[in-house]
From Swiss-Prot:
The keyword Nuclease does not apply. Belongs to the prespore-cell-inducing factor family. The gene is psiB. The keyword Kinase does not apply. This is Protein psiB. It comes from Dictyostelium discoideum (Social amoeba). Residues 114-255 form the PA14 domain.
Amino acid sequence: MKLLSVLITFLLATVIYSQTNPATLTFTVQVYDQFPGYNNNFQTNGAGARVTGLIKSTLNSTTRVPELVSTATGGLNGVGLILNPSLFPYFFSPQQDSSLPGQNSPLSLDLVFTYDTTRNIYVYNNQNFFPIDNQGLDVDPAKRIYLNGATYHNYHFCMKMNTVFTYKGYEVFNFQGDDDVWVFINNKLVIDLGGVHGPLAASVDATTLGLTIGNSYNFDLFFCERQTVGSTIKIETNLLFVCPFEDYCGVCQGDGSSCCNPLTTCNDNNQCTIDSCPPANTTIGSGSISDYCIHTPKINTNPIDICFNYQCNSSTGNFDPIPIPCLDRSSECLSTIGCNSTVGCQYESICNSNVCNIQNQCSSNGTCVPKSSNDCGIELDGQVDKCKIYSCDSNGGVGCIKEDKCKPSEDKCHVVSCDSLTGSCITTPLEDPLAGLHLCSIARCNSSTGEFTYDPIICTPSSNPCISTQCNATNGQCYETQIPGDICDCGCGIPENKCKVSWCTPEGICQPKFKSEIDDNNSCTLDSCDPCTGIISHMTAPQCLSCNQCSN
């Protein structure tokens, strides 16, 4: 069984100017209910002892709560049964978030001091000091598991008292107690009874602290009950405490946590705010404390991204990325293809998807510029060919195409060509491949096939039957020649005399004459012709029968 008995004696000087002291004084202090399941520095069940030097000798002037000298386990902390140094800050500071270690429940407690007229001191004496039974965390029956025999009490809590007194020059105080008790005057540690231990006593003579009469000094008392099973407290004081301010919970220099829980009192159901209680010195006027809560917007800790704005999700508290809309640049023929976190919005020309548009070129009215025939000419040939017709076919991504301006004639006997300087179409007859070889023939072209045939030139006959007309193969001209009379058929034959033929004179007169072959021009023959049969005979002349020396 553990006995908690704290005896702190604050000797009060007689009130100056014979002021009558009230019969009772009520001082509201801050209490932090603890539960061993949340903070294992409580109910360690170890063999404790008084340990000095656990906390720093100078009080933190900002937080005004003690700080451990070391955060290491073991050593002095182990002797003082501080098994988990990381949770020590929650001995005297609020931690109301159940999702985090070290949860406690802040409460306020009124200590009522009674004036002892015989000794001119105020006394608080409670030999069964269980001020927060069934309160704080122990509102949950499952937490009421620590007993003294069959009797339940709340054995795990810490208390702090932060106030100010004006030094008169004669103050002293004495106390007796068990478990952690630390007292600071002027932010200096003057009582050091750390650890889990039995009742111990200590005294402080304020006249030995180098204080100046008339000056005001901080007085800070810290007390913890950390283990079952007994608890007593007795306080006697003649110090004239002055409370610089009370928090809105009524606690002297309190932090507001005894009546304000940021997770419940100040919960605005918006996960995008950090809810906190009002500053401790806030004056609560009309309305409730929750009307004065502070709701600080959460700060986005995501790296800056020029493609996204981060917006807090009020349901989750997470910062969701919201894409930043890219500018509409359709008037520049540009479409968005996404955003790059380094350079921002990316665009591409809508004109580039059509092969018949000039790449990356947009008109002033926001439409793509189509390729002209000249553009296609330059693209295909390096320059415009006047003998070509250029166009662009977007179907199937074909792009620029060209065709001859001058189309072949349907008449195969004519050739269509183009003047490269003017682009004019010129039609010329198909050239005879045998031209010059058949001057006495007329070449004829088949318009369906383009093939040539050749008809001979017919020269006009002469009216003179003794004149022949014919074509000159060297120049293709018709010319006349005289037909020898003996072969000229004048049409005046003598049928009754078969030894004669027609003879045509140069004048064209028909005169019959003997056939020329009757005369063989041999003087040794006698030439004759049978007029009836036309048989020619050549008999030897008589004069040539003997000599055979006839001359021709």
